Amino acid sequence: MQDNWPTRLAITCLLVAIERLGMYIPVGLISNPQANWLNGGGWFVLGIIPTINASIVMQILISIVPALTRLQKEEGEMGQKQIQKYTRYLTFFLAGIQAFTLSQQWCTWLLIVSGAMLVMWLAEQMTHKGIGNGTSIFVCSNIAANFLHHPIEAPWSLAMVVLIFTMLGMIALQEAVRAIPILSAKQLIQSIAQVYLLPMRLNQGGVMPIIFASSTLALLHTWSIWWLYVACIIFFSHFYNLVIANPKELSENLNKMAVVIPSIRPGAETQQYLNRTLNRMSWIGGIALSLIALLPWLFSSLKIFSGFGATSLLIVIGVSIDTMRQIRTYFIANAYEKMI
């Protein structure tokens, strides 16, 4: 974090306030103001959903199109900017399609699309200048605002039990790490007995697999099919793990640093070992995340939170955990800077 803590907090609050205000600015005739499951209409009726959908499509394209894969991995910062540019174009395209389903009037359509693009820009600014991931924060703020309009119908004791168990499950999953022992050339030469570990998070994507799965089901209008929801979570969890922790890149980086995994040969064998490890972790993490996602659904008949679904609860908890982790990292880094 380049800026100080109060500045980033102020920027985050300001951007969230702007995004929420845009939800209530009327834009004319909208055929279906309830089309977005995260807000209730207005200029920003599409919210962050087009950006999320564009990110999903772009990540899939990067994994299957060699030219985009090279652009992301080999072109460095310029490649990332180009990928971001393509994502913006795709966001505009998807926002245009969704806006047309809401209104066929040219002026209203243009306002809705411009609102979606502005929300995307606000999310980017929050990611770079505020606290946490802008997309996740906007999703969380919209859900929290919706929650304030719906009372808790079940007894507080039952609501707290479900909330606590869900929160504990998310925390355990977010903090779970597989530590792989590694040896450096310096250790071998100097006979250093200290053990170094390569930590790999069980759930690399955090709450993003749930957000992506929810967005996909909302787009397909298939909320009632619970097994499809589980399948989407497992798929996106597996996909995110392989994107964030690429076995080939990890193997090459370890080789460049003259670091090896005990009993595993450098190169292809190390890559295969990391690939097997990540695949197992992806399945375990995806299934665990799905089970946690289904936990509040077991109590759906009790209507603990009227108008506040299980997915919403998980997203709020997950985003809160991710944001707190980033804040903690900032304070630790700041303390180290003062020591130096």
From Swiss-Prot:
Record-annotated membrane-spanning stretches: 10-30, 42-62, 106-126, 152-172, 204-224, 225-245, 282-302, 304-324
| An annotated GO BP | protein targeting
The keyword Glycosyltransferase is assigned to this record: no
Pfam entry (one): SecY
Membrane topology, as annotated, equals:
Multi-pass membrane protein
One Gene Ontology term, aspect cellular component? chloroplast thylakoid membrane
Q: Does the keyword Chloroplast apply?
A: yes
**Which residues are connected by disulfide bridges in this protein?**
none
The Swiss-Prot or TrEMBL record describes its family as follows: Belongs to the SecY/SEC61-alpha family.
Function per UniProt: The central subunit of the protein translocation channel SecYE. Consists of two halves. These two domains form a lateral gate at the front which open onto the bilayer between TMs 2 and 7, and are clamped together by SecE at the back. The channel is closed by both a pore ring composed of hydrophobic SecY resides and a short helix (helix 2A) on the extracellular side of the membrane which forms a plug.
Quote the protein name from its UniProt record.
Protein translocase subunit SecY
Per the UniProt record, the lineage of the source organism begins with: Eukaryota, Rhodophyta, Bangiophyceae, Cyanidiales, Cyanidiaceae
Chain's gene name: secY
